[in-house]
Amino acid sequence: MKSFIRSFLVIIALGVLAGATLIWSGLYNVAADEPHWKATLWLVNEARERSVEAHSRGSVTQPLQGERLVERGFPHFNETCRLCHGGPGLSPLEFTQGLYPKPPFFPSKEVQQELSDSELYWIIKHGFKMTGMPSFGVTNSEEDLWAIVAFMRRLPTLPPSEYQAMAQRAGKS
């Protein structure tokens, strides 16, 4: 048993040494225009998905029905989220082409199906480290955050003309 523990500790120490060498050597390229290594991409994606899943479990999902809630979420989405995530008939702004990873296109039904309401709420509230996705929980109330979720859930079925009409009513284009 002692030899197993000793071997295990040596393997751990070698892993830490290899990781430290990789970091200090500058070998790993952190540039946004250089994709992650496959192993790094897998690790980051798994960590993100498991973290969101685990931390969003405690979120009490709010009812998302009602036009007033959707209307309340629109200005928040239009002024901030749309820039990176696009909108009905609207592509994300040009600067997002340089982001890595690319922000998901939320008007897409397929993208919407990947996240539960509580997961989407958690992401909006807390953001993601080192991705460009900010935490909106520091500047928005719980009610506003749920209104953003309600509005985002409408995106896949919202015609571009209706989105534009909402923007005009809100005084934004």
State what each model feature region is.
Residues 84-90, 125-126, 137-138, 153:
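Detector for the c-type heme attachment site
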Residues 93-98, 163:
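Short cysteine/histidine-rich zinc-coordinating motifs and their immediately flanking basic loops
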Residues 99-105:
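Short glycine/proline- and charge-enriched loop/turn segments
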Residues 108-125, 132:
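Glycine-rich active-site/cofactor-binding loop and its immediate structural neighborhood
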Residues 159-173:
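Extracytoplasmic/periplasmic copper-protein system
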Residues 66-90, 122:
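Sequence/structural segment immediately N-terminal to covalent heme-attachment motifs in c-type
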Residues 2-71, 95, 115-119, 136-151, ...:
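Periplasmic c-type cytochrome electron-transfer domains
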